[in-house]
Amino acid sequence: MSDARRPDPTPAPSTPARPTVDEAAPVVNPHMYALVVAVTYLPVLLSGMKLDVRGTEHVPPPGTPLVIAANHVSGLDPFLVARALPRGRFLQFMAKKELFLPVIGWIIRTGGSFPVDRSGNDVASIRTALRVLKENGTVGIFPEGTRGGTELHGGVALIAAKGRAPILPAGIRRDGRRWIVTFGPPISPKGGIKAVTAELGTELARLSQAG
């Protein structure tokens, strides 16, 4: 038997580390963000409509974590809410992954938004949202999931509770030649997932139908 030393077996490749809350949040470029908000408002202007914003006194000042939950009625919703926010609040929406195509996906990412897989429990997107909140950012979510949805998902309350951030309800509706965005009083995330989700549903229904 040979005394030659056999080479050590090739080590198995290590499994990539799973993302943690300590990783960096998606970056918002303020100049590109402002450009995206301005450009995406053009369809509203060109159609002869205008944006009517109400309840801005309910929006907490910048520098604090915030979750904005809005009803979903059109493809313009994220941009209408972003434009309605006071200066200094950069809205980072959880957008469906199907939108992240080569061109429009770049635009969305430039604004700091990030994809979510609506087919199941997307743990990665939740962790990304928590990173944004940890850095005192603003996460935007459509709790109905799709346009015109009637059932709210509990993910908003879960993210707000884990991120220790209030939920700012935003009602969106169209009235003739106006898009109306109405912010309501912030909702505390401490009441339990079901209770907070129910309260949010009541507020969104009220704000989206307000006169």
Segments (PLM) and residue ranges:
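Non-catalytic C-terminal accessory region of glycerolipid acyltransferases
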Residues: 2-31, 64, 123-211
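Short, glycine/polar-rich helix-capping loops at beta-to-alpha or helix-loop-helix junctions
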Residues: 36, 100-104, 176-178
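Short acidic-hydrophobic, aromatic-tinged amphipathic segments that line or gate anion-handling sites
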Residues: 53-54, 114-117, 188-189
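Catalytic core of membrane glycerolipid acyltransferases/transacylases, capturing the structured
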Residues: 60-120
